[in-house]
UniProtKB/Swiss-Prot annotation:
GO terms for molecular function: ferrochelatase activity; metal ion binding. The lineage of its organism: Bacteria, Bacillati, Actinomycetota, Actinomycetes, Mycobacteriales. InterPro entries: Ferrochelatase, Ferrochelatase_AS, Ferrochelatase_C, Ferrochelatase_N. The keyword Cytoplasm applies. Fe-coproporphyrin III binds at residues 52, 121. Belongs to the ferrochelatase family. The gene is cpfC. Involved in coproporphyrin-dependent heme b biosynthesis. Catalyzes the insertion of ferrous iron into coproporphyrin III to form Fe-coproporphyrin III. Its EC number is 4.99.1.9. PANTHER family: FERROCHELATASE (PTHR11108), FERROCHELATASE, MITOCHONDRIAL (PTHR11108:SF1). It is an enzyme of class 4 (lyase). Fe(2+) binds at residues 181, 264. It catalyses: Fe-coproporphyrin III + 2 H(+) = coproporphyrin III + Fe(2+). Keywords: Cytoplasm, Heme biosynthesis, Iron, Lyase, Metal-binding, Porphyrin biosynthesis. This is Coproporphyrin III ferrochelatase.
Length: 346
């Protein structure tokens, strides 16, 4: 399959104080979230001047993708679109149409299956094509990449760097925690079932092994919504408190669920969890996310090559890449058929 463009598709984020509330209203539209709750979340962004890191990181990533294309001797225009803020996906697809693009690969800045991590990006693609009208380019989403060797390598390396930042006498006893964004249990059950949580669990095992850890914990973070609705657990804050009770003196936190420093990383982890850990007498080191690492750019182009048929899928050994599963080469599939469920649980 040939492509004449690449679309980097992401979540979006505000880039100034006056954009914070409109952005949050976009994110929560139709969910009935009280405005006072939005105002509370807005304070997290305002702590950083109303600027989310994500757009700047994505622009830097696009720069790395373009540089990598040049290093490979390839020419492929790269476009940028978001779900919730400027530049919107509708504008990006319309620009591609106006530039004469006929078929584009779509690289979503999410490594996972499930609804918000995959299906919603397919909905974004459909919305973008609808906005561009009858002459809209064909858009093909690239696969989930939770098991790509470069993603595993980047996270494993970042764990080692984080460990070295701890006091020398605490490094060997530090507990390694992998964290990802929690979602409602019912939502996880509907997609796969449990494709998202299974992929996170599998990637956690891959990265831990690559980093040289046989013992670690997988936790969840950033839940929202009414307490009566069950979300994936354990919550990272509850788990850190439990570790303190057991006498743990240091933790290394790897935000494996995030490919970039979203506000959930720089606020929820670097501010809230770090403050909690300090209050409990626990030293904390946070592993970096891929952000705009050149290897992340290479990963994106590897996926394009896979879909073009130029190379076999790159996966860490242990995952069956059978077509039709949520982790097939064509990333439009966001949940498994029943025959696929057992393939990433062993």
């Amino acid at each position: 399959m040939l492509f004449d463009a690449l679309l980097v598709l992401s979540f979006g984020g505000p880039e100034g104080p006056d954009q914070v509330m409109p952005f949050l209203e976009n994110v929560t539209r139709g969910r009935g979230i009280p405005r006072e709750r939005l105002a509370s979340v807005a304070e997290h962004y305002l702590h950083f001047g109303g600027v989310s890191p994500i757009n700047g990181i994505n622009r830097a990533l696009i720069g790395e993708i373009e540089a990598e294309l040049g290093a490979r001797g390839e020419t492929l225009p790269v476009y940028f679109g978001n779900r919730n803020w400027d530049p919107y996906v509708e504008d990006a697809v319309t620009a591609m149409r106006d530039d004469g693009v006929r078929r584009a690969a779509v690289f979503a800045t999410s490594a996972w299956g499930g609804y918000s991590s995959c299906t919603q990006y397919n909905e974004d693609i459909a919305r973008g094509r609808a906005a561009a009208g009858d002459s809209a380019p064909q858009l093909v989403k690239l696969r989930h990449y939770f098991d790509h060797p470069l993603l595993v390598e980047m996270f494993a390396e970042s764990i080692g760097v984080a460990a070295q930042s701890l006091p020398a006498d605490l490094r060997d006893e530090a507990r390694l925690l992998f964290t990802a964004h929690s979602i409602p249990v019912a939502a996880d059950d509907r997609h796969g079932p449990n494709l998202y949580s299974r992929q996170v669990a599998y990637a956690t095992r891959l990265v831990a092994a690559a980093a040289g850890y046989s013992e670690f914990d997988q936790v969840w973070q950033s839940r929202s919504g009414p307490p009566r609705i069950p979300w994936l657990e354990p919550d990272i804050g509850d788990h850190v408190a439990a570790l303190a009770e057991r006498g743990t003196k240091a933790v290394i936190i790897c935000p494996i669920g995030f490919v970039a420093d979203h506000i959930e990383v720089v606020w929820d982890l670097d501010s809230e969890v770090r403050e909690q850990a300090a209050d409990l007498g626990i030293a904390m080191a946070r592993a970096r996310t891929p952000n705009a690492d050149r290897r992340y750019a290479r990963l994106a182009l590897d996926l394009v090559d896979e879909l073009r048929g130029d190379r076999d899928p790159l996966r860490v050994a242990g995952v069956d890449p059978a077509p039709g599963c949520g982790y097939s080469v064509d990333g439009t599939t966001c949940a498994d058929s029943p025959r696929c469920v057992a393939r990433i649980t062993g």
